[in-house]
Protein backbone atom coordinates (compact mmCIF):
# COMPACT_ATOMS: atom_id res chain seq x y z
CA UNK A 1 0.00 0.00 0.00
CA UNK A 2 2.85 2.35 0.86
CA UNK A 3 4.62 1.53 -2.37
CA UNK A 4 1.42 2.11 -4.33
CA UNK A 5 0.95 5.50 -2.70
CA UNK A 6 4.51 6.47 -3.49
CA UNK A 7 4.01 5.35 -7.07
CA UNK A 8 0.90 7.49 -7.41
CA UNK A 9 2.71 10.46 -5.88
CA UNK A 10 5.56 10.09 -8.37
CA UNK A 11 3.12 9.92 -11.25
CA UNK A 12 1.36 13.05 -10.01
CA UNK A 13 4.63 14.93 -9.59
CA UNK A 14 5.77 13.85 -13.06
CA UNK A 15 2.49 14.98 -14.61
CA UNK A 16 2.66 18.32 -12.82
CA UNK A 17 6.24 18.83 -13.96
CA UNK A 18 5.31 17.92 -17.53
CA UNK A 19 2.37 20.35 -17.44
CA UNK A 20 4.58 23.10 -16.01
CA UNK A 21 7.23 22.52 -18.66
CA UNK A 22 4.58 22.61 -21.39
CA UNK A 23 3.23 26.00 -20.35
CA UNK A 24 6.73 27.32 -19.77
CA UNK A 25 7.57 26.27 -23.33
CA UNK A 26 4.41 27.93 -24.63
CA UNK A 27 5.24 31.13 -22.77
CA UNK A 28 8.84 31.16 -23.99
CA UNK A 29 7.84 30.46 -27.57
CA UNK A 30 5.11 33.07 -27.45
CA UNK A 31 7.59 35.70 -26.37
CA UNK A 32 10.14 34.59 -28.96
CA UNK A 33 7.82 34.98 -31.98
CA UNK A 34 8.99 38.35 -33.22
CA UNK A 35 8.16 37.86 -36.91
CA UNK A 36 5.96 35.85 -39.24
CA UNK A 37 6.69 34.25 -42.59
CA UNK A 38 4.10 34.97 -45.29
CA UNK A 39 4.14 31.95 -47.61
CA UNK A 40 2.15 33.85 -50.24
CA UNK A 41 2.23 32.12 -53.61
CA UNK A 42 5.08 29.56 -53.73
CA UNK A 43 5.73 29.66 -57.45
CA UNK A 44 8.97 29.39 -59.39
CA UNK A 45 11.26 32.41 -59.58
CA UNK A 46 10.18 33.20 -63.15
CA UNK A 47 6.51 33.22 -62.21
CA UNK A 48 7.29 35.32 -59.13
CA UNK A 49 8.88 37.95 -61.40
CA UNK A 50 5.85 37.81 -63.69
CA UNK A 51 3.50 38.25 -60.72
CA UNK A 52 5.61 41.17 -59.50
CA UNK A 53 5.31 42.88 -62.89
CA UNK A 54 1.56 42.29 -63.22
CA UNK A 55 0.66 43.35 -59.69
CA UNK A 56 2.97 46.37 -59.87
CA UNK A 57 1.07 47.46 -62.96
CA UNK A 58 -2.32 46.98 -61.29
CA UNK A 59 -1.14 48.91 -58.24
CA UNK A 60 0.06 51.85 -60.35
CA UNK A 61 -3.19 51.84 -62.35
CA UNK A 62 -5.16 51.83 -59.10
CA UNK A 63 -3.27 54.86 -57.81
CA UNK A 64 -3.55 56.80 -61.08
CA UNK A 65 -7.23 56.01 -61.66
CA UNK A 66 -8.35 56.89 -58.15
CA UNK A 67 -6.23 60.06 -58.04
CA UNK A 68 -7.88 61.16 -61.29
CA UNK A 69 -11.33 60.70 -59.74
CA UNK A 70 -10.33 62.70 -56.66
CA UNK A 71 -8.84 65.53 -58.75
CA UNK A 72 -11.85 65.63 -61.07
CA UNK A 73 -14.28 66.02 -58.17
CA UNK A 74 -12.02 68.56 -56.50
CA UNK A 75 -11.53 70.75 -59.58
CA UNK A 76 -14.99 70.65 -61.16
CA UNK A 77 -17.46 72.89 -59.31
CA UNK A 78 -20.39 71.09 -60.93
CA UNK A 79 -19.41 67.96 -59.00
CA UNK A 80 -19.55 69.67 -55.59
CA UNK A 81 -22.69 67.73 -54.71
CA UNK A 82 -23.31 65.16 -51.94
CA UNK A 83 -23.17 62.27 -54.41
CA UNK A 84 -19.72 63.16 -55.74
CA UNK A 85 -18.35 64.21 -52.35
CA UNK A 86 -19.11 60.69 -51.10
CA UNK A 87 -17.68 59.31 -54.32
CA UNK A 88 -14.43 61.23 -53.77
CA UNK A 89 -14.02 59.52 -50.38
CA UNK A 90 -14.24 56.12 -52.03
CA UNK A 91 -11.15 56.40 -54.31
CA UNK A 92 -9.17 57.93 -51.44
CA UNK A 93 -10.15 54.91 -49.39
CA UNK A 94 -9.24 52.54 -52.22
CA UNK A 95 -5.73 53.99 -52.45
CA UNK A 96 -5.01 53.25 -48.80
CA UNK A 97 -6.82 49.91 -48.95
CA UNK A 98 -4.45 48.53 -51.59
CA UNK A 99 -1.43 50.31 -50.09
CA UNK A 100 -1.93 48.45 -46.82
CA UNK A 101 -1.07 45.13 -48.50
CA UNK A 102 0.28 45.42 -52.05
CA UNK A 103 3.72 47.03 -51.40
CA UNK A 104 4.58 44.32 -48.86
CA UNK A 105 3.34 41.62 -51.25
CA UNK A 106 5.47 43.05 -54.07
CA UNK A 107 8.53 43.09 -51.80
CA UNK A 108 7.93 39.44 -50.91
CA UNK A 109 7.91 38.46 -54.58
CA UNK A 110 11.54 39.61 -54.77
CA UNK A 111 12.55 38.38 -51.32
CA UNK A 112 13.76 34.97 -50.21
CA UNK A 113 12.61 35.33 -46.60
CA UNK A 114 9.07 36.78 -46.96
CA UNK A 115 9.09 37.87 -43.34
CA UNK A 116 7.03 40.51 -41.57
CA UNK A 117 7.52 41.64 -37.98
CA UNK A 118 4.97 40.81 -35.29
CA UNK A 119 3.94 44.46 -34.92
CA UNK A 120 4.02 44.98 -38.70
CA UNK A 121 1.73 41.99 -39.20
CA UNK A 122 -0.91 43.28 -36.81
CA UNK A 123 -0.62 46.83 -38.15
CA UNK A 124 -1.28 45.46 -41.64
CA UNK A 125 -4.16 43.41 -40.23
CA UNK A 126 -5.61 46.52 -38.55
CA UNK A 127 -5.34 48.89 -41.51
CA UNK A 128 -6.51 46.31 -44.07
CA UNK A 129 -9.63 45.46 -42.06
CA UNK A 130 -10.26 49.08 -41.04
CA UNK A 131 -10.16 50.21 -44.68
CA UNK A 132 -12.41 47.34 -45.73
CA UNK A 133 -14.87 48.11 -42.94
CA UNK A 134 -14.88 51.81 -43.82
CA UNK A 135 -15.58 50.84 -47.43
CA UNK A 136 -18.74 48.97 -46.40
CA UNK A 137 -19.94 52.03 -44.48
CA UNK A 138 -19.29 54.36 -47.43
CA UNK A 139 -21.06 52.00 -49.82
CA UNK A 140 -24.03 52.12 -47.43
CA UNK A 141 -23.86 55.93 -47.26
CA UNK A 142 -23.77 56.17 -51.06
CA UNK A 143 -26.79 53.86 -51.31
CA UNK A 144 -28.67 56.03 -48.79
CA UNK A 145 -27.76 59.16 -50.75
CA UNK A 146 -29.04 57.67 -54.03
CA UNK A 147 -32.22 56.49 -52.32
CA UNK A 148 -32.97 60.00 -51.07
CA UNK A 149 -32.09 61.63 -54.40
CA UNK A 150 -34.33 59.37 -56.48
CA UNK A 151 -37.17 58.59 -54.08
CA UNK A 152 -37.45 62.12 -52.60
CA UNK A 153 -36.07 64.44 -55.30
CA UNK A 154 -37.96 67.53 -54.10
CA UNK A 155 -36.80 67.18 -50.49
CA UNK A 156 -33.28 66.02 -51.35
CA UNK A 157 -31.55 69.47 -51.38
CA UNK A 158 -32.99 70.21 -47.94
CA UNK A 159 -32.44 66.79 -46.40
CA UNK A 160 -28.94 66.27 -47.78
CA UNK A 161 -27.00 69.56 -48.11
CA UNK A 162 -23.26 69.45 -48.72
CA UNK A 163 -22.35 70.14 -45.10
CA UNK A 164 -24.54 67.32 -43.83
CA UNK A 165 -22.99 64.99 -46.39
CA UNK A 166 -19.52 65.87 -45.10
CA UNK A 167 -20.67 65.23 -41.53
CA UNK A 168 -22.09 61.88 -42.62
CA UNK A 169 -18.69 60.84 -43.96
CA UNK A 170 -16.88 61.43 -40.66
CA UNK A 171 -18.70 58.64 -38.73
CA UNK A 172 -17.95 56.23 -41.58
CA UNK A 173 -14.22 56.80 -41.10
CA UNK A 174 -14.43 56.73 -37.30
CA UNK A 175 -16.55 53.57 -37.07
CA UNK A 176 -14.44 51.86 -39.70
CA UNK A 177 -11.25 52.33 -37.69
CA UNK A 178 -12.86 51.38 -34.36
CA UNK A 179 -14.92 48.36 -35.38
CA UNK A 180 -12.25 45.62 -35.43
CA UNK A 181 -10.16 46.76 -32.46
CA UNK A 182 -11.43 44.01 -30.13
CA UNK A 183 -10.83 41.04 -32.51
CA UNK A 184 -7.37 42.35 -33.39
CA UNK A 185 -6.48 42.72 -29.72
CA UNK A 186 -7.72 39.21 -28.88
CA UNK A 187 -5.76 37.60 -31.72
CA UNK A 188 -2.59 39.50 -30.82
CA UNK A 189 -2.75 38.03 -27.29
CA UNK A 190 -2.79 34.40 -28.47
CA UNK A 191 0.31 32.23 -27.79
CA UNK A 192 1.86 31.15 -31.10
CA UNK A 193 4.29 28.46 -29.81
CA UNK A 194 7.07 29.24 -32.29
CA UNK A 195 4.68 28.61 -35.21
CA UNK A 196 5.09 31.61 -37.49
CA UNK A 197 4.33 30.48 -41.06
CA UNK A 198 1.17 32.10 -42.43
CA UNK A 199 -0.23 30.44 -45.54
CA UNK A 200 -1.36 33.73 -47.04
CA UNK A 201 0.09 36.84 -48.70
CA UNK A 202 -1.19 39.08 -45.89
CA UNK A 203 -1.93 38.86 -42.17
CA UNK A 204 -5.48 37.51 -42.08
CA UNK A 205 -7.36 36.46 -38.91
CA UNK A 206 -8.10 32.90 -40.02
CA UNK A 207 -4.48 31.81 -40.62
CA UNK A 208 -3.32 33.73 -37.53
CA UNK A 209 -5.80 31.98 -35.23
CA UNK A 210 -4.76 28.59 -36.62
CA UNK A 211 -1.16 29.32 -35.60
CA UNK A 212 -2.16 29.50 -31.95
CA UNK A 213 -0.90 26.54 -29.90
CA UNK A 214 -4.01 26.59 -27.70
CA UNK A 215 -7.64 26.41 -28.89
CA UNK A 216 -9.26 29.82 -29.21
CA UNK A 217 -12.97 29.12 -29.77
CA UNK A 218 -14.10 32.35 -28.11
CA UNK A 219 -11.85 34.44 -30.36
CA UNK A 220 -13.05 32.55 -33.44
CA UNK A 221 -16.69 33.06 -32.49
CA UNK A 222 -16.15 36.78 -31.82
CA UNK A 223 -14.42 37.22 -35.20
CA UNK A 224 -17.22 35.32 -36.96
CA UNK A 225 -19.88 37.45 -35.25
CA UNK A 226 -18.07 40.69 -36.11
CA UNK A 227 -17.70 39.65 -39.77
CA UNK A 228 -21.30 38.45 -40.11
CA UNK A 229 -22.86 41.48 -38.42
CA UNK A 230 -20.83 43.91 -40.52
CA UNK A 231 -21.35 42.19 -43.86
CA UNK A 232 -25.02 41.25 -43.57
CA UNK A 233 -26.21 44.46 -41.88
CA UNK A 234 -24.59 46.77 -44.43
CA UNK A 235 -25.58 44.52 -47.34
CA UNK A 236 -29.19 44.46 -46.10
CA UNK A 237 -29.18 48.26 -45.85
CA UNK A 238 -27.75 48.63 -49.38
CA UNK A 239 -30.15 46.14 -50.98
CA UNK A 240 -33.13 47.70 -49.17
CA UNK A 241 -32.11 51.16 -50.38
CA UNK A 242 -31.80 50.00 -53.98
CA UNK A 243 -35.06 48.10 -53.80
CA UNK A 244 -36.72 51.44 -53.03
CA UNK A 245 -34.71 53.07 -55.83
CA UNK A 246 -35.81 50.46 -58.38
CA UNK A 247 -39.44 50.82 -57.32
CA UNK A 248 -39.22 54.60 -57.71
CA UNK A 249 -37.45 54.38 -61.08
CA UNK A 250 -40.05 52.02 -62.51
CA UNK A 251 -42.68 54.65 -61.75
CA UNK A 252 -40.88 57.28 -63.85
CA UNK A 253 -42.97 57.77 -67.01
CA UNK A 254 -40.15 58.63 -69.42
CA UNK A 255 -37.65 56.03 -70.63
CA UNK A 256 -34.93 58.71 -70.63
CA UNK A 257 -35.46 59.38 -66.93
CA UNK A 258 -35.30 55.68 -66.14
CA UNK A 259 -32.11 55.27 -68.12
CA UNK A 260 -30.44 58.22 -66.37
CA UNK A 261 -31.38 56.89 -62.93
CA UNK A 262 -30.20 53.36 -63.71
CA UNK A 263 -26.92 54.61 -65.18
CA UNK A 264 -26.26 56.64 -62.03
CA UNK A 265 -26.89 53.67 -59.73
CA UNK A 266 -25.53 50.96 -62.02
CA UNK A 267 -21.89 51.79 -61.35
CA UNK A 268 -22.44 51.70 -57.60
CA UNK A 269 -24.23 48.34 -57.81
CA UNK A 270 -21.38 46.91 -59.89
CA UNK A 271 -18.83 47.84 -57.22
CA UNK A 272 -21.11 46.52 -54.46
CA UNK A 273 -21.55 43.19 -56.25
CA UNK A 274 -17.81 42.68 -56.79
CA UNK A 275 -16.85 43.68 -53.26
CA UNK A 276 -19.54 41.89 -51.27
CA UNK A 277 -19.45 38.77 -53.43
CA UNK A 278 -15.73 38.43 -52.71
CA UNK A 279 -15.74 39.13 -48.97
CA UNK A 280 -18.68 36.79 -48.41
CA UNK A 281 -16.74 33.95 -50.03
CA UNK A 282 -13.74 34.68 -47.81
CA UNK A 283 -15.34 35.42 -44.43
CA UNK A 284 -18.85 33.96 -44.18
CA UNK A 285 -18.95 31.03 -46.63
CA UNK A 286 -17.99 27.38 -45.88
CA UNK A 287 -14.57 27.98 -47.50
CA UNK A 288 -13.75 30.60 -44.85
CA UNK A 289 -12.20 27.94 -42.64
CA UNK A 290 -9.69 26.83 -45.28
CA UNK A 291 -6.79 29.32 -45.29
CA UNK A 292 -4.87 27.38 -47.94
CA UNK A 293 -7.82 27.08 -50.29
CA UNK A 294 -9.81 29.40 -52.46
CA UNK A 295 -10.01 32.28 -49.97
CA UNK A 296 -6.38 33.32 -50.55
CA UNK A 297 -7.08 33.83 -54.25
CA UNK A 298 -10.44 35.50 -53.65
CA UNK A 299 -8.71 37.93 -51.27
CA UNK A 300 -6.20 38.64 -54.04
CA UNK A 301 -9.11 39.25 -56.42
CA UNK A 302 -10.98 41.84 -54.34
CA UNK A 303 -7.96 43.51 -52.69
CA UNK A 304 -5.56 43.75 -55.66
CA UNK A 305 -7.20 42.95 -59.00
CA UNK A 306 -10.59 44.70 -58.82
CA UNK A 307 -9.52 48.15 -57.43
CA UNK A 308 -8.03 49.26 -60.80
CA UNK A 309 -11.42 48.73 -62.44
CA UNK A 310 -13.47 50.72 -59.92
CA UNK A 311 -12.47 54.14 -61.37
CA UNK A 312 -13.39 52.86 -64.83
CA UNK A 313 -16.75 51.63 -63.58
CA UNK A 314 -17.53 54.99 -61.98
CA UNK A 315 -16.32 57.11 -64.90
CA UNK A 316 -17.44 55.18 -67.98
CA UNK A 317 -21.07 54.95 -66.85
CA UNK A 318 -21.35 58.54 -65.63
CA UNK A 319 -21.59 61.44 -68.09
CA UNK A 320 -20.76 64.12 -65.52
CA UNK A 321 -17.66 62.25 -64.38
CA UNK A 322 -16.49 61.66 -67.95
CA UNK A 323 -16.89 65.35 -68.71
CA UNK A 324 -14.99 66.33 -65.55
CA UNK A 325 -12.15 63.93 -66.43
CA UNK A 326 -12.03 65.31 -69.97
CA UNK A 327 -11.67 68.85 -68.58
CA UNK A 328 -8.99 67.68 -66.15
CA UNK A 329 -6.90 66.02 -68.86
CA UNK A 330 -7.33 69.04 -71.11
CA UNK A 331 -6.08 71.33 -68.32
CA UNK A 332 -3.08 69.09 -67.64
CA UNK A 333 -2.11 68.98 -71.32
CA UNK A 334 -2.49 72.77 -71.60
CA UNK A 335 -0.20 73.37 -68.62
CA UNK A 336 2.41 70.96 -69.96
CA UNK A 337 2.46 72.56 -73.42
CA UNK A 338 5.89 74.14 -74.10
CA UNK A 339 5.98 77.88 -74.67
CA UNK A 340 2.65 78.41 -72.91
CA UNK A 341 2.04 81.98 -71.79
CA UNK A 342 1.81 82.31 -67.98
Task: Go through each PLM region and give its residues.
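Charged structural interfaces that engage phosphate-rich ligands
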Residues: 1-21
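Transmembrane helical core of 7TM receptor-like proteins
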Residues: 20-342
Amino acid sequence: MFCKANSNMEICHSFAALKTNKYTHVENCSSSVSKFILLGFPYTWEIQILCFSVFSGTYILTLIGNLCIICAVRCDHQLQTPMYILLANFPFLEIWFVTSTVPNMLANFLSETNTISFSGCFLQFYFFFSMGTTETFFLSAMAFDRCLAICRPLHYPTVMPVQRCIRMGAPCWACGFLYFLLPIYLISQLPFCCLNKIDHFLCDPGPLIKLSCVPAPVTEIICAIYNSVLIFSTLFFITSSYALVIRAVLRVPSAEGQQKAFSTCGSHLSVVSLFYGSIMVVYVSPTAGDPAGIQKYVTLFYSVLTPPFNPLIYSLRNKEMKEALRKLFKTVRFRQRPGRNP
